[in-house]
Amino acid sequence: MDETIATGLRLPSGLVALQDGRFALVEMDTSRRCLKLFDTSGAHQEICRIGGSPTGIAIDGDGCFWVADGPENSLVRLSPQGRVLQVIEGSADGPFLHPNALAFGPDGLLYMTDSGIRLDDLLEGGRIHPDFFKAAYNGCVYQIDPADGRVIRVLAAGLLFASGIAFDANGLLYYSETLTGKVHRQIIGGRQELFVQSMTSPAINMLRGPSGLAFDRSGVLYCAMYGLGEISLVDTEGRMAGHIRTNGTRPGSIAFTIDGKHLLVSEQENGVVEKITAPRPGLPLHMPTIS
């Protein structure tokens, strides 16, 4: 069953389930740029106005929020009350361009995708530039020490709009490359490999492709297909195993509820969060204690 549990949102993006059953979500639109908490009834509370173009979110074991693409394209750590605790602006190689999605690993470190292009270079008059595919992307995947607030290393570079990121039950890292339709898999510190090609052709004329990622407990990967109006299911061998249609065409981020029974989807065409009954229970996220 698919139901809408939050409406009136403006470019809803990253979302994450909390231990008490609520979920947190960020809105990218310039009129919002905020972090909100939602309960199961859809009632919400705005925690803070972050600034920037908040895109991704993760929560640690201290209950603090990590938000990708805060002011000046930064990664920001916020207290449960929304107070800024830490700001990370880049690596030794230079500043971040457009931080996108976040996931804590089994090692307690934080992993982040950077789309590889500044939003100002991607947009024209508030809309996607018609020549977006020809832009000079350098999408990256970063390994970050959250305690020290520094980038440890770059795990991947040169990606065409790096987007979603997730770990499977075996600790392997997965991340999506939206414009090519690829989802990559990687042992931390090892070589990148193609896990699945989710589209038959690259996104040349319309921004579309794999975005947010999440795993269920059986190892199936759930991949939000932005611009295509569906969640693709991929089995452990990298084969397409099914599709779940969304009500809108632009699903971006996905997350399982804390009990694992439902999938939450932020959908930008209608400005909503959709709640979908999960075929199988979701895999719990890593939430390490930092302080």
Regions found by a protein language model. Name each.
Residues F38-A43, S79-R83, D145-G149, I187-R191, ...:
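Short loop/turn segments that connect beta-strands within beta-propeller blades
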Residues R33-K36, S74-V76, G139-Y142, K182-H184, ...:
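A short loop-to-beta-strand structural motif that recurs across blades of beta-propeller domains
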Residues M28-T30, G70, S115-I117, T178-L179, ...:
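Short loop/turn segments immediately following the C-termini of beta-strands
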Residues G8-R22, I50-D69, A92-L110, A135-C140, ...:
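Beta-rich, blade/repeat-based domains predominating
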